[in-house]
Amino acid sequence: MPPESSLNAEMSKKISFFGLKGLKLWVWVCLVVGVFIVMILCILSLWITFRRKSRRSSSKFPFNQIPHVSKDIRVDRAGFQNPHPESLYIEMNDKSTGKTMMSHLGRTKSSDNDTLSQCSSVNHHERACSSHSGEEGGFGSAGRQYGGGPVTASPLVGLPEISHLGWGHWFTLRDLELATNRFAPVNVLGEGGYGVVYRGKLVNGTEVAVKKLLNNLGQAEKEFRVEVEAIGHVRHKNLVRLLGYCIEGVHRMLVYEYVNSGNLEQWLHGAMRQHGNLTWEARMKIITGTAQALAYLHEAIEPKVVHRDIKASNILIDDEFNAKLSDFGLAKLLDSGESHITTRVMGTFGYVAPEYANTGLLNEKSDIYSFGVLLLEAITGRDPVDYGRPANEVNLVEWLKMMVGTRRAEEVVDPRLEPRPSKSALKRALLVSLRCVDPEAEKRPRMSQVARMLESDEHPFHKERRNKRSKTAGMEIVETKDESLGPSGSETKP
């Protein structure tokens, strides 16, 4: 009998299994193969489902998904044994205490507390002092701290602990939709190329500002990471506090404390002027607070933070007229061994330091120049660049140098200021501003020195046996020596 006929005969035999009779062998073979295939499909289905769930759960640790975008931002994985092997740590050195802190970007409870600040005034307004969020910050070389007052509760109190991180809070998209009424247009506080800022209220009643970043060619990822790593782990009463963030799908959002009295640009040039004009004391309080914040970023922590976009609209003001430096989307971090970095020129026209604009070399001296322009803006009430004015008055810095050089310094004061500042107060502020905008970067003072100058009730340079006369922008200004400060504001060697 041919083999084919024998095989057909065998496959056609009727066999009984499991009580089933009369089924041919080939039918049983097909049933077994079919059951095997179904089992394989079930196993694959279970495996795929498990993988999807594991991906969802891993997305709750968002920093593992964000690519490193700048070599200037140093994020160190912990080099010691720790209970969170997949967590990230950011190394921070506080120069004022000599301590090294490791900021943990993993799941743990938050214990952030705040302190309060002071009071100031505005024409036609009376405001009482009250407790306000903020924290102390120290100046490394100055050896002192600014801030103080009773400790107040964290704005994150009452939120689900499962979302707490070491320095802030992880918010879901649903959390922020509820807080902002689904990002209603009526809650828009401001917008720009970076995205839109909304006012919101968390479930615990805390008012917040939610920055929703626009994902233009990955810019949202870049700005998100820069801001989180620049200020997510630092606390100072004059820095706007980053409360947390949201990463969900393509959404990148940052959640800040809500600062309720606008910004310096609005008070000097915009809508807040309808509430009255800032007094000289209020302006100097805002400027001094900004100087303290920059001194903390430049001198009290490592790596130091260069803000790169100091301008009036980034100086938020609370209801006690305390400055809150904000918007760190352009910030760069410098290690202690770096004198500068080379980077693409970014910033706001009129505030950018000339050496940075010309060469792309960036360090903290660029921020100091921008601060000097900001101080001039507060003194004069003028924009840094105003093409609506005569040609010789378009550039604020050049116009002021010309006015000082022709001995007309008292004419530069904002005409809306009532009462006007004393001659000594005006002279001190002008001297500080001119030193900050010195075209030679190395001659600009450090921000801790600037803060001390602005806080002093006397001339910033104490008298010695003899005065040294120098010319600043063409006008002779008596500039006395300090035992520790040279004519450029830098430390002198014994």
From Swiss-Prot:
It is an enzyme of class 2 (transferase). Residues 462-471 have a biased composition (Basic residues). SMART domains: S_TKc. Residues 183-462 form the Protein kinase domain. It is found in: Membrane. GO terms for cellular component: cytosol; membrane. This is Probable receptor-like protein kinase At2g42960. It comes from Arabidopsis thaliana. The lineage of its organism: Eukaryota, Viridiplantae, Streptophyta, Embryophyta, Tracheophyta.
